[in-house]
């Protein structure tokens, strides 16, 4: 189309050198040949990473706490209310969360690289295109909410829990559409290093959420319906606040208004979004499978209770890893877009070192206090003993799971989602799960065997990702990023999608 050609020429006629970005390097770092040079560049990069990772970690914790706070208040209503909210939050909303966050992660690649190259006008089109795709996905996923009761009954939940969860899930349908707008919007802002404003919005949302939930439960006595109203409202508050921030003009050229271009070249965008979703969901569901398999052991109640405590701790520590994942994804995509391959590679190295140190510190603390911390979660002596026995593998898991998301963040920043999805399938589901079941059931190692086997799958996946990154030609990746940016309107290159 002539209109396409004109816009393409306009984009490509922009200044050849991208403008200096607030937290992107003005030029590529020189080769590092001395210890002093390494320390100097390390200190510079650490500041850039933590400028992004700090607010991202805080934001992850506050948004994670919305559901956690709702569960706490549900426990004051009734046992069945707590069960309903917990199952909806972990199974129904958890499944949708993985799909939506994964599909929204496509913007980390496209917006991050376009921003790094200074092609700001493309970001708004990418954002709108993702809104279209994720809202269509939300319509499909809403069927999961509508039919939650029969689905849960089919997989073995009791009639009482299935019925109560089914009703609460229907109340929570607005949440899935909030996800559809929120995650692309968050990635759009994240790619521009505007994470501080998202952290502030999430903090305000959490404070209001706790106050309003207390009011509708203790004051108005609305029960689970009140919990749903407030939780939906909290997520939509985050969405509206972010949109107001964008529409106010604070993003400059990155948002120039709504455009019909959002409906062009959707299939290429869908392919990258699906690859991102598959990559993330395979990781999220893998951790859920550990508890599922533990439920079929002889002492299922004790095994599941102990493993749930460990997974709860692992979940909170994962918020740190998720924040670092977001930071390194932005840094790598920005630097590749700006044609700074050495800086992108060094940013990865700094992130891996930082994440490893944090993971080791947390793990050592758990090992030191392994005789004390389990009693904070449970009073049953049998469960406490199992948690103590699982602490060493929990410590190893924390270290591995602190590094692995950083490597995945690089994959997103570089646009390797489809390849990593295949790696996850083989490492997790072809190797990890069968090995865990072999150790847990056939060799009678129980819950520890299941977890050890599946952790081995994560270790193999981490090794494969490390091997891929070590073999990467970062100059080639920078050139590929430039090629993607030159595809006007976001038509993703075959190199990105295959």
UniProtKB/Swiss-Prot annotation:
Gene Ontology CC terms, in alphabetical order: plasma membrane
CDD domains: MATE_eukaryotic
One GO molecular-function entry: antiporter activity
Transmembrane segments: 64-86, 91-111, 136-156, 161-181, 197-217, 227-247, 277-297, 302-322, 349-369, 393-413, 419-439, 447-467
Highest taxon of source: Eukaryota
InterPro entries for this protein: MATE_euk (IPR045069), MATE_fam (IPR002528)
Gene Ontology biological process: response to nematode; xenobiotic detoxification by transmembrane export across the plasma membrane
The UniProt record lists the keyword Membrane: yes
Record carries keyword Membrane: yes
Topology class, membrane: Multi-pass membrane protein
Family recorded in the similarity comment: Belongs to the multi antimicrobial extrusion (MATE) (TC 2.A.66.1) family.
Protein name, entry field: Protein DETOXIFICATION 30
């Amino acid at each position: 189309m002539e209109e396409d050609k004109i816009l393409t020429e306009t984009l490509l006629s922009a200044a050849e050198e991208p403008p200096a970005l607030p937290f992107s390097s003005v030029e590529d770092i020189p080769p590092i040949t001395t210890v002093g040079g390494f320390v100097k560049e390390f200190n510079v990069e650490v500041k850039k990473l933590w400028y992004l990772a700090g607010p991202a970690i805080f934001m992850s914790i506050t948004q994670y706490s919305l559901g956690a706070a709702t569960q706490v208040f549900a426990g004051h209503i009734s046992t069945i209310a707590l069960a309903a909210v917990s199952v909806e939050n972990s199974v129904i909303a958890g499944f949708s969360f993985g799909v939506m966050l994964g599909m929204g992660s496509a913007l980390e690649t496209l917006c991050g690289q376009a921003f790094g190259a200074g092609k700001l006008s493309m970001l708004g089109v990418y954002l709108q295109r993702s809104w279209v795709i994720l809202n269509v996905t939300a319509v499909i996923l809403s069927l999961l909410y509508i039919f939650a009761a029969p689905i849960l009954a089919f997989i073995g939940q009791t009639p009482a829990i299935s019925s109560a969860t089914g009703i609460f899930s229907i109340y929570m349908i607005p949440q899935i559409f909030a996800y559809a707008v929120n995650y692309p919007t968050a990635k759009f802002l994240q790619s521009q290093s505007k994470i501080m404003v998202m952290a502030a919005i999430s903090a305000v949302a959490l404070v209001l959420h706790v106050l309003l939930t207390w009011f509708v439960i203790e004051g108005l006595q609305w029960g689970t319906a009140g919990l749903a109203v407030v939780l939906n409202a909290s997520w939509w508050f985050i969405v509206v606040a972010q949109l107001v921030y964008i529409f106010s003009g604070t993003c400059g050229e990155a948002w120039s208004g709504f455009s019909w271009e959002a409906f062009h070249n959707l299939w290429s965008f869908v392919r990258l979004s699906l690859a991102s979703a598959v990559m993330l969901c395979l990781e999220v569901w893998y951790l859920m499978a550990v508890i599922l398999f533990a439920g079929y052991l002889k002492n299922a109640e004790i095994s599941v209770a102990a493993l749930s405590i460990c997974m709860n701790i692992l979940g909170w520590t994962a918020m740190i890893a998720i924040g670092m994942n977001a930071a390194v994804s932005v840094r790598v995509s920005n630097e590749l877009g700006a044609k700074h391959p050495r800086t992108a590679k060094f940013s990865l190295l700094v992130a891996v070192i930082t994440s490893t140190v944090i993971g080791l510190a947390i793990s050592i603390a758990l090992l030191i206090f392994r005789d004390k911390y389990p009693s904070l979660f449970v009073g049953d002596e049998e469960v406490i003993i199992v948690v103590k026995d699982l602490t060493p593998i929990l410590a190893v898991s924390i270290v591995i799971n602190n590094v692995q998301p950083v490597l995945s963040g690089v994959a997103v920043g570089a646009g390797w989602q489809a390849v990593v999805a295949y790696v996850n399938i083989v490492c997790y589901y072809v190797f990890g799960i069968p090995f865990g079941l072999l150790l847990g059931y056939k060799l009678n190692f129980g819950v520890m065997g299941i977890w050890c086997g599946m952790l081995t799958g994560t270790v193999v996946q981490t090794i494969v990702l490390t091997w891929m990154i070590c073999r990467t030609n970062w100059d080639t990746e920078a050139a590929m990023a430039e090629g993607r940016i030159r595809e006007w309107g976001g038509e993703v290159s075959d190199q990105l999608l295959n």
